[in-house]
């Protein structure tokens, strides 16, 4: 009598990779497809392959830049690996845990360790809450500190992000764009995370304010031993802040390497074309554009 053996899918990540404590994030063959329409003739559904088989690893305490043109799947990658939306397939390990295999309760327990800073600081902040409540809401919900230490803790976090204690009672509309982004960073930092996805955190800001926010992120990384996935279309910013860089095109990771190596010697034709569009601050120098 033939017995049917239950098929057990082998993990995509090796045991050695999982046991390496330096690997805070491991992404293997991540896919995220969005259904768009169903054919009347065949009855089959078509899909947009926003993320199509992306793999990379981020070392603890480092910053990985993720670049590419609009619509290439950068932000979808960041949101999916945090499980803000469900995957189509693939595996994502954060601190050795496969995040898509966790139950809702297990996921809730690790949420404080994985945070995100969104692109638009105004739309990502509740207009109905004062800044102190915005930053402290998650702290109170997850019991990060005892109740008697709550106020002092929020004050310390705000000051670390360049905000003042008297800002607690103000509302988001009373702040500039740069200050609002500091509030978003403070909200993420207050939960004592290990890993933060920075989803184009400076693209909506003036150049001078961009530099301040980038320097703030770097200082916080050193002080709190943070790891970043820095998503941006601004290549000069990515070159400044990142240790490694991944280049995405049409949902695929076409190139991934150390920052210095990829900027000095890009290999993929799309990477070369992308870098050829970086403006040179000297008007006497002409660069060959690759279209």
Residue ranges and their predicted role:
Residues 201, 205, 209-284:
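P-loop NTP-binding/switch modules centered on Walker-like glycine-rich loops
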Residues 82:
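Helix-to-loop junction immediately C-terminal to a conserved catalytic motif
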Residues 190-194:
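A short, proline-enriched helix->beta-strand linker immediately N-terminal to the Walker B motif
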Residues 171-175, 179:
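Conserved ABC ATPase signature
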Residues 1-23, 35-42, 47, 258-291:
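Short catalytic/signature loops enriched in Gly
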Residues 90-98, 110:
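Conserved ABC transporter NBD signature motif
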Residues 98, 148-166, 275-276:
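Conserved ABC ATPase "signature" region
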């Amino acid at each position: 009598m033939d017995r049917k053996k239950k098929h057990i899918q082998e993990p995509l990540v090796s045991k050695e990779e999982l046991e390496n404590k330096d690997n805070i994030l491991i992404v293997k063959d991540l896919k995220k497809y969005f259904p768009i329409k169903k054919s009347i003739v065949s009855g089959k559904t078509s899909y947009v392959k926003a993320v199509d088989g992306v793999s990379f690893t981020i070392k603890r305490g480092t910053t990985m830049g993720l670049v590419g043109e609009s619509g290439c799947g950068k932000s979808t990658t960041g949101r999916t690996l945090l499980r803000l939306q469900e995957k189509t397939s693939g595996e994502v390990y954060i601190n050795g845990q496969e995040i898509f295999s966790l139950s809702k309760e297990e996921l809730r327990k690790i949420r404080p360790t994985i945070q995100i800073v969104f692109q638009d600081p105004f739309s990502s902040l509740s207009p109905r809450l004062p800044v102190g409540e915005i930053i402290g809401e998650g702290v109170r919900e997850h019991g990060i500190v005892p109740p008697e230490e709550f106020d002092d803790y929020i004050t310390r976090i705000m000051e670390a992000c360049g905000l003042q204690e008297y800002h607690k009672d103000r509302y988001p509309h009373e702040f500039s764009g740069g200050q609002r982004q500091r509030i978003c960073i403070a909200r993420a930092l207050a939960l004592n995370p290990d890993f933060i996805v920075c989803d184009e955190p400076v693209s909506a800001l003036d150049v001078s304010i961009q530099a301040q926010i980038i320097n703030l992120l770097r200082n916080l990384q050193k002080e709190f031993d943070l790891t970043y996935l820095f998503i941006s279309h601004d290549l000069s910013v990515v070159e400044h802040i990142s240790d490694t860089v991944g280049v995405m095109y049409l949902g695929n990771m076409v190139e991934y390497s150390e920052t210095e190596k990829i900027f000095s010697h890009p290999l993929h034709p799309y990477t070369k074309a992308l870098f050829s569009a970086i403006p040179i601050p000297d008007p006497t120098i002409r660069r060959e554009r690759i279209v």
